[in-house]
C-alpha cells in the first residue's frame, strides 16, 4: 500500500501512518506446532478469520489493521513478534534483492539518526549466503537514505531502534518491519531467570495444547 511522504528531522520519528485504517499484511512467528493455537488466539483478540488468516508451519499471516497490531502486541500469549510486511516479490539473485529493498520507503518509518539491524530467515532459499543477503539489504537501506538526505542510519546489532526482517522462501523474498521490539515473551516482569526458565510463549502454548485455556471461538473448524 502507498505510504504518505514523511521525513525524520534529527532524531525524531517520522509521522507514520499509524492512524490510517488501511489493510496491513502481518506475520506472527511462533514455535513450530503452535500455529493453530495462535490462529485461534488471533481470532479471539481481533475477530480475524477465514481469508484474513493464513496458517503456515511456524507462524501465521494475518490481514489486519493498526488497531490489530497494537492489540496483538499487548495481549498475544503465543506470538513471538508481530511483523509488518513492507515488500514481497520474486527474488532469485542478490541484485534483485537489493533492488527490492531499495524500493521500500524506509524514510517513512525511521530516520538517519536511528539505528537498525537486519535479521534473516530462510526456507528452501537459493541464496548461497544468508549473511550476504542481509548485507545487501543493509546496503540498500543505507543507499536509499543517502540518496535522499545525504546521510544514512547506522547499523547496530545490540538493541537497535529498528529491526528489519528478511525472509527468503524459495524464489521469493519478504521484507518485514518488527513492530514489537523485544520478543513478546520478554514482558519486563521477570527479575530472576532461575536455573531453568521457561519462555512465557512456550508456557502459554503448553496450556493451550492441554486444553486448559481455550479461546471463545475457533478460527479454523
Feature names for model-found ranges:
Residues 1, 125-128, 189-193:
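Short coil/turn segments at secondary-structure junctions
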Residues 1-2, 19-21:
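Basic Arg/Gly/Lys-rich low-complexity intrinsically disordered segments
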Residues 216-221:
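Conserved class I S-adenosyl-L-methionine
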Residues 164-177:
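C-terminal edge-of-domain segments
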Residues 175-213:
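SAM-dependent Rossmann-like transferase core, predominantly class I methyltransferases
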Amino acid at each position: 500500500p502507498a505510504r504518505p511522504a514523511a521525513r525524520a528531522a534529527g532524531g525524531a520519528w517520522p509521522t507514520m501512518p499509524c492512524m490510517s485504517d488501511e489493510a496491513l499484511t502481518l506475520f506472527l512467528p511462533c514455535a513450530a506446532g503452535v500455529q493453530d493455537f495462535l490462529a485461534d488466539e488471533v481470532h479471539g483478540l481481533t475477530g480475524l478469520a477465514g481469508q484474513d488468516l493464513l496458517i503456515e508451519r511456524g507462524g501465521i499471516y494475518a490481514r489486519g489493521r493498526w488497531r490489530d497490531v497494537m492489540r496483538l502486541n499487548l495481549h498475544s500469549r503465543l506470538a513471538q513478534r508481530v511483523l509488518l510486511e513492507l515488500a514481497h516479490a520474486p527474488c532469485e539473485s542478490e541484485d534483485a534483492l537489493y533492488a527490492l529493498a531499495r524500493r521500500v520507503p524506509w524514510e517513512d518509518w525511521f530516520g538517519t539518526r536511528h539505528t537498525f539491524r537486519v535479521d534473516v530467515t530462510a526456507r528452501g532459499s537459493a541464496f548461497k549466503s544468508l549473511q550476504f543477503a542481509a548485507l545487501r539489504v543493509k546496503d540498500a537501506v543505507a543507499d536509499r537514505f543517502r540518496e535522499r538526505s545525504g546521510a544514512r542510519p547506522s547499523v547496530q546489532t545490540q538493541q537497535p531502534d529498528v529491526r528489519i526482517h528478511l525472509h527468503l522462501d524459495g524464489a521469493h523474498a519478504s521484507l518485514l518491519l518488527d513492530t514489537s521490539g523485544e520478543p513478546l515473551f520478554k514482558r519486563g516482569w521477570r527479575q530472576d531467570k532461575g536455573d531453568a526458565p521457561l519462555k512465557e510463549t512456550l508456557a502459554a502454548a503448553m496450556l493451550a495444547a492441554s486444553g486448559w485455556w481455550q479461546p471463545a471461538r475457533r478460527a479454523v473448524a
